[in-house]
Swiss-Prot record:
Zn-finger region bounds: C4-type: 40-61
Name by which UniProt lists this protein: Acetyl-coenzyme A carboxylase carboxyl transferase subunit beta
Chain's gene name: accD
Cofactor comment: Binds 1 zinc ion per subunit.
SUPFAM superfamilies: ClpP/crotonase
Pfam families in the cross-refs: Carboxyl_trans (PF01039), Zn_ribbon_ACC (PF17848)
Organism: Limosilactobacillus reuteri subsp. reuteri (strain JCM 1112)
Gene3D superfamilies: 2-enoyl-CoA Hydratase, Chain A, domain 1
Length: 289
């Protein structure tokens, strides 16, 4: 086939990529939208983004992709009234660039920090809801996050409501130092007061739930659920291996392995969560009458 005036010659006489080919390749790349194709972190299946349902679940292995809090909210509940959306961190350690990073993420996520809290309902079952957002500094636990979750439990205790909390976190936020770690104890105390009032607390562990969140309120629930293949643990895999100087099993920190050892009550697919939560909330409310 003869080469036309506008055709692209892939290689020159020296068998190297031609300048015209590089330009054409760049133009083609610019026409492909970002996130058009995704690779499942668990089974490594290549996924066409437009074929994913609203639940953002891998059709091959049921792994739930990491999604923003408001995305989860859109299919989880029937109504929602947001709490404490104006709370702001004061950058207590004056960490360089931290305030700018927070401001940028606030614009992107429409959240003031890494958790969305409020009063929600599913089929007339009213409850207090918290959803941690892995797109906001990996759902890390800072002072505002801890304060919002604490206030959520205090509201639930006062109004005698169950609490449902979706966890997704890399742990305590390093930019806030010891003040971040203090949130673990503060939230746990609010949970203790909620439990003392005889009220139900349901946790749903999503990918990833690690660090100080796992070491505190993620494991304090009366009922602990988890999404398929969610990473759940305290220290990261590399930290563990560097500490004990040996490899750990690939599934050691998987939700399935933790279920096997009795720390999780049930693995629930994302598309089944709303129905299961409705049943649990209804059962809990009857038991509490």
């Amino acid at each position: 086939m003869e080469e036309g005036a506008d055709s692209v010659k892939l290689y020159d006489q020296n068998n190297t990529l031609s300048e015209r080919h590089i330009k054409a390749d760049k133009n083609a790349d610019e026409r492909v939208p970002d996130q058009m194709w995704l690779r499942c972190p668990h089974c490594h299946q290549l996924l066409f983004a437009k074929q994913l349902t609203q639940y953002a679940v891998c059709p091959n292995c049921d792994y739930g992709l990491r999604i923003p809090a408001r995305h989860r909210l859109s299919w989880l509940v029937d109504s929602f009234k947001e709490f404490d959306k104006d709370l702001q961190t004061k950058n207590p350690l004056h960490f360089p660039g931290y305030q700018e990073k927070i401001s940028k993420l606030q614009r992107q996520t429409k959240l003031n920090d890494s958790v969305l809290t409020g009063e929600a309902s599913i089929n007339d079952q009213l409850f207090s809801l918290g959803i941690m957002d892995p797109t906001f500094i990996m759902g890390s636990l800072g002072t505002v996050t801890g304060e919002k979750i604490t206030r959520l439990f205090e509201y639930a205790t006062t109004h005698r409501q169950a609490v449902v909390l979706f966890t997704a976190s890399g742990g305590a936020r390093m930019q806030e130092g010891i003040m971040s770690l203090m949130q673990m104890a503060k939230v746990s105390q609010a949970i203790n007061e909620h439990a003392a009032a005889g009220l139900l607390y349901i946790v749903v562990l999503t990918d990833p739930t690690t660090g100080g969140v796992t070491a505190s309120f993620a494991m304090d629930g009366d009922i602990i659920l988890a999404e398929p293949h969610a990473l759940v643990g305290f220290a990261g895999r590399r930290v563990i291996e560097q500490t004990i100087h040996q490899q750990i099993p690939i599934d050691l920190q998987s939700a399935e392995n933790i279920l096997h050892h009795g720390f999780i009550d049930r693995i629930v697919k994302r598309q089944d969560e709303k129905k299961l939560l409705e049943w649990l909330l209804k059962t809990g409310s009857v038991a509490n009458e």
